[in-house]
């Protein structure tokens, strides 16, 4: 098993993890029965981990969402089905590896699964562009969704990106147009769409595959109009204000559920999905099946109409005389 990567706020667990590893090595190298000591230490570590994760700040949740060992789109696909066939290419000369898709089945029901894909190490992240899709990636996604629409396949999307790639070439090749076209076309698809934020849900890069009948989020995932670092740099000219920006942006599942932006917050195992990926997979699979079963009973016209209404009610119109009230809610920079 790969060595666990602990986040900075998990430091109280470091010593316990070392002791657990030492006892496991002792058990492997000798015939000494250490099962009781191991059980006690693992129980203590689990209790402390649960205490830590019960009170995470939005900024800490971002760290969990970006955890390098957090289950990715491909991890969930492999948990859900063993007959998945990846489909490649945008039919315009490109095959973006940051956004993948293919056909598989869940409980003998054929579905299209597509999502952002990050790497596990530097080499993989270079290939996957750190999960930041280029215009070709969104065009590939649209091609696959149109294929699913043609063959009446429900669509499952997995969102995990800091945002769409913002390089010069991406802009020259129509990044904004590619995402906007996806938004427009997804509103008209006649098949159920269930989207899940499995890690980071960043800006337009997330929205490009996020127009769905049901939008789910894991407990420690985040969904935001801009990264807190970018927001802090814009508002306060100071990236160090990212924790304050994270709180102001309302990026957590709890906040977004209250605002009516998402439909369900999925619980995570103690310590986050990276501690028990299979448990996370079971939770997600059950939720997807529940929502798909409900959506498949709806007539096509009603499905499209409800999807349209879902997004039309988002946001709030505020009269000009209330602008000061809005600004008063934004944390101000202190000297």
UniProtKB/Swiss-Prot annotation:
Keyword Phosphoprotein applies: no
The CoA carboxyltransferase C-terminal domain, residue ranges: 40-294
Pathway as given in its UniProt record: Lipid metabolism; malonyl-CoA biosynthesis; malonyl-CoA from acetyl-CoA: step 1/1
Source species, domain of life: Bacteria
A Pfam family that the UniProt record links to this protein: ACCA
A GO MF label: ATP binding
Subcellular localization: Cytoplasm
Enzyme Commission identifier(s): 2.1.3.15
Keyword set, alphabetical order: ATP-binding, Cytoplasm, Fatty acid biosynthesis, Fatty acid metabolism, Lipid biosynthesis, Lipid metabolism, Nucleotide-binding, Transferase
Example GO biological process: malonyl-CoA biosynthetic process
Recorded catalytic activity of this chain's protein: N(6)-carboxybiotinyl-L-lysyl-[protein] + acetyl-CoA = N(6)-biotinyl-L-lysyl-[protein] + malonyl-CoA
InterPro entries for the chain: Acetyl_CoA_COase_a_su (IPR001095), ClpP/crotonase-like_dom_sf (IPR029045), COA_CT_C (IPR011763)
PANTHER family according to UniProt: ACETYL-COENZYME A CARBOXYLASE CARBOXYL TRANSFERASE SUBUNIT ALPHA, ACETYL-COENZYME A CARBOXYLASE CARBOXYL TRANSFERASE SUBUNIT ALPHA, CHLOROPLASTIC
Family classification: Belongs to the AccA family.
Subunit structure: Acetyl-CoA carboxylase is a heterohexamer composed of biotin carboxyl carrier protein (AccB), biotin carboxylase (AccC) and two subunits each of ACCase subunit alpha (AccA) and ACCase subunit beta (AccD).
Function: Component of the acetyl coenzyme A carboxylase (ACC) complex. First, biotin carboxylase catalyzes the carboxylation of biotin on its carrier protein (BCCP) and then the CO(2) group is transferred by the carboxyltransferase to acetyl-CoA to form malonyl-CoA.
Name used for this protein in its record: Acetyl-coenzyme A carboxylase carboxyl transferase subunit alpha
Native source organism of the sequence: Prochlorococcus marinus (strain MIT 9301)
Gene from which this protein is expressed: accA
